[in-house]
Amino acid sequence: LVSELNSNAGRQFSFTKDVVLKTALTITDVDLRFKVSNFTQTNMAKVEEGWPQIEGALLRAATLLQQFGYSERNLTANSVIVPIAYYLHLRGAGDSYLDSTADAADRLALQRWVTRSLVKRGIWGSGLDTLLTRIRDVLRTNSTNGFPVAAVEEAMAAVGKSLAFDNAEIDELLNLKYAGQRTFSVLSVLYPGLDLSKRF
């Protein structure tokens, strides 16, 4: 699955087995921390039983990231795929979600959230398990009417991962250099009409 995520269908990512396992634990609704006590026979049976859904959600999430214009060159946090895959799983989203007109607004909301979370420093670093658990809890109870951006951002802010930018952060973004890791994300916000699935 890792090689398929990273290089199939034109994708170029560098997802690891750890990201796949973290996603599997998230989707099966078990404790997602990498602790020996979490890898019980019961939990691993849940992962095995849910593997087709886990695999499908991860592959669709990787395709979405590719459609958003991301690759290993500019995806600054591989962990962002975890909540995307979980959300797609909860929705029961099939391949049609990736390009259906009916889901275009939802994909755009998801893309904007992903982009802001990648532009803002410190979101996907320390405290990752707490962040992913909070996002999972919000998605589990708020995913029926599309990606719940406001609820997710509120939960993120509650654990010190606000997506609000202050003036100093905005000034820093204005000074990003060509080919910097976050430059693509900032430009994708400034030029929303571009087809970002094309490689620039």
Can you name each region flagged by the protein language model?
Residues 1-93:
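Polyanionic (Asp/Glu-rich) segments that form extended negatively charged tracts
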Residues 1-5, 103, 200:
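Short intrinsically disordered, low-complexity coil segments enriched in acidic
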Residues 29, 40-43, 71, 99, ...:
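Serine/threonine-rich low-complexity intrinsically disordered regions
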Residues 40, 55-56, 60-63, 70, ...:
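Mixed-charge, low-complexity interaction segments
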Residues 50-54, 114, 187-188:
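Generic hydrophobic, helix-prone segments enriched in Leu/Val/Ile
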